[in-house]
């Protein structure tokens, strides 16, 4: 017998077995890869899960990139399904590496307004990516708006005609009985306060204050005035019956935290200088505030406040609305979640002229 005879079929059997094992190994690796690709997307440093960088997202959850943190101050990012009822969650991140895949980019104007061409995203945006212009400042404090024309698809601001309306505050009906304690009038030991950071000696609000204080004592807090240590504002302002909620510029819907937080949270009656009374009444009951336009002069306003100081029943009438309504306040997290809701609610793609609209 040829000693090599039986060797040939033995070698062939081993070869077939090796080939089958190799093919089985390749198949296992392939299906394992598919499973990992499906179940374990790329994890970015903030812990959010996003698709690969092909430029065409395969995700169903909207991915929102915050191009900058507002005023460069990071916040805890929310679960939008918990903040805005009826809204599905979005992936919200400030990690610019996800820019090619982002469904939307929120640009806070303050951080880009001094040099928009250098500070806006430079890489080409992917098809369908929506840019959201975001500002809570008035047009008087927003520079270089014309440089933004042609870039943005949605607006987000305090203006009620924004695509995404983010007011500084609003009133919400109580779901049951009011849970706050009644106003402790005996704790209101002072009359009028004003906290101001940007003085602006030639501004309308400072000129009005100077005329008012000739007839009425007003305690002014802030830079170059009475100190107001951090964390003591509400405790301090709650001692006052009235608060001057004077805006730094006069524009439609520009009703800021000066009214919503400084006055209403301190349970002080707001004395407002800003847009028209009718504009305020779109957001507040007419007896929830005092408007300077209701008086022919600061002297007349001073006389009225002094009358209310002595007439407890009339003063307390400015709090009747609290029996059915409660103030709610703006937050950055809520604004981002409103953008999340809008992106899922409406897919329309448009280009806005920011400069023509925001005046």
Swiss-Prot record:
Pathway annotation from the record: Protein modification; protein glycosylation
Presence of the UniProt keyword Secreted in the record: yes
Record-given protein name: 4-galactosyl-N-acetylglucosaminide 3-alpha-L-fucosyltransferase FUT6
Job description of the protein: Catalyzes the transfer of L-fucose, from a guanosine diphosphate-beta-L-fucose, to the N-acetyl glucosamine (GlcNAc) of a distal alpha2,3 sialylated lactosamine unit of a glycoprotein- or glycolipid-linked sialopolylactosamines chain or of a distal or internal lactosamine unit of a neutral glycoprotein- or glycolipid-linked polylactosamines chain through an alpha-1,3 glycosidic linkage and participates in surface expression of the sialyl Lewis X (sLe(x)), Lewis X (Le(x)) and non sialylated VIM2 determinants.
Gene name of the record: FUT6
Top EC category: transferase
Entry's family note: Belongs to the glycosyltransferase 10 family.
Taxonomic source organism: Pan troglodytes (Chimpanzee)
Any GO CC annotation of this UniProt entry: extracellular region
One Gene Ontology molecular-function label: alpha-(1->3)-fucosyltransferase activity
Ranges where the record places region determines site-specific fucosylation: 73-112
Topology with respect to the bilayer: Single-pass type II membrane protein
EC annotation from Swiss-Prot or TrEMBL: 2.4.1.152
